[in-house]
């Protein structure tokens, strides 16, 4: 039997067959993994190595009417307290909070604590403890709703298991943070913290504290603090909706708990435009936790660019001249004075400038807060929109229009000033010139009465016109009611029998004649006075006062909104009435106000006022408009304890000159390349 001469060749063929089969199987598996199930496997790989992260959109910028950037953004760091890592270990959470508080106290850092209870050795509930949202918090946590401060604090200590090793003062600070965390796993503890504090946080000793990047506000001006406003973390009472008041909380608006929101001013008023839409991204990491890539599944959209009606150059002049005028009134109580000024564009209601004195610096607001709160001059109080003052003789313009339009008098009607008004047995008020010099203004018409500010003339005209008609015209001028300004204001008081009855006050015939000269119960804001004059010199077109000019997308590529409201009402003041009233205002600038208005670059009209607020103490009021023959701007200035309104004439001239000598070029708003993501 012969042997196979080539046994090795057969083995080669067998091995080659096995190898080919292996290759076929390998490529089949590879095809299945890469092609058939490729997308599924890639998704599984990403899921196992990535985490989804919210990318906070930067807040929109704010500009003046000429595009000059007033508020923008910069990169900053925030501290977020997250209780989820503590589980049910209340003691560890409280200890971590206390360590963080001690660090912040050491570094002089303020943190977000809106619990309506004072801090210190004997914490006391504040007036905010009466709000519906806080009462709801107490109910939800079965805390005493009618207990005293000590009882509420003790109950909160028990609720959050704050042990007896902490004093009441320390416990108050801890429960303040626990209050913020109620109903949520984390909250923004502090914003825009220093790099020094960050270094302390990152040493690993502060459990439950994370550092996040955020866009902090940059204030490119020290002006308009009361207009621009501030931003801050969402407070507990802002988070929840309140059905009883109709308030819609940020939770129901789609916000994240740690978002920054506007707290006051235009930051709050235009929150819907300034707040951007957050993005989402997937962060890919390796086995060591090192980031190896990122994928944006939704790009963040920065907030819109809000252009205000304010002219920041005019705002500078208004703030400076108001401050120098008040500071120049040298006497023992000059430091107690405050004041406000407003400038409105005639025929639109646009607020061109608005100042309140004293003011503050938004850039250092958080650091200065404690001192600002203690300042008895109330620098955070916006006197232009929240302060109410008797208008004094500036109200005589309204009385003049009412009497002329109703046919009570004509432009040529003569009334003789007899010094003491004796129509009533009581009261029998005197004209100011009789009280001061024992003389009278003689026989005068309405234009002359405006120049002389003759009280006797307006006592008689007020009596003849009656309070019903006076109030009808005052209301049409917008006095005693909100101006509609977006940052909010108070209505003030329009004197009337109905108001007096509703507030348990007396109303007599004497109230009517004193109301006619701007006294009685009349109390208006400086912004109301400016809008009243703007309405008057326009012939009666009454507009809402407003700060919004337009809103554009963050890259200025499209217009989102433009203010476009027409007049609220129109008095349709007759030409003869307009001529008589504006003649009086114009003549005044050539009479007792000549020294101030001699340097005015355009012809103007004005009216002074002085309102008694105590024995030998009076607030000074002043209104003006320009130009005389084609009104463009209206001005109101009020100075507490300012005496005669004539002392404010120079400030008004400064404002008029600034407006009519401006170059009007403005600046270009920042484009998208100037914005953060």
What is the role of each PLM region?
Residues 537, 589, 653-664:
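Short amphipathic alpha-helical signal-transduction/dimerization elements
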Residues 1-274, 278-299, 332, 339-340:
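Membrane-proximal periplasmic segments of bacterial cell-envelope enzymes
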Residues 59, 205, 321-348, 356, ...:
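Flexible, solvent-exposed loop/hinge segments and secondary-structure transition points
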Residues 71, 77, 285-301, 310, ...:
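Beta-lactam-recognizing serine transpeptidase/beta-lactamase-like catalytic domain environment
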Residues 186, 291-339:
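Conserved, well-ordered alpha-helix/loop/beta-strand core segments that scaffold catalytic motifs
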Residues 663-677:
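Gram-negative outer-membrane assembly/targeting C-terminal domains
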Residues 91-98, 102, 195, 199, ...:
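Solvent-exposed, polar/charged alpha-helical surfaces in well-ordered, non-transmembrane soluble domains
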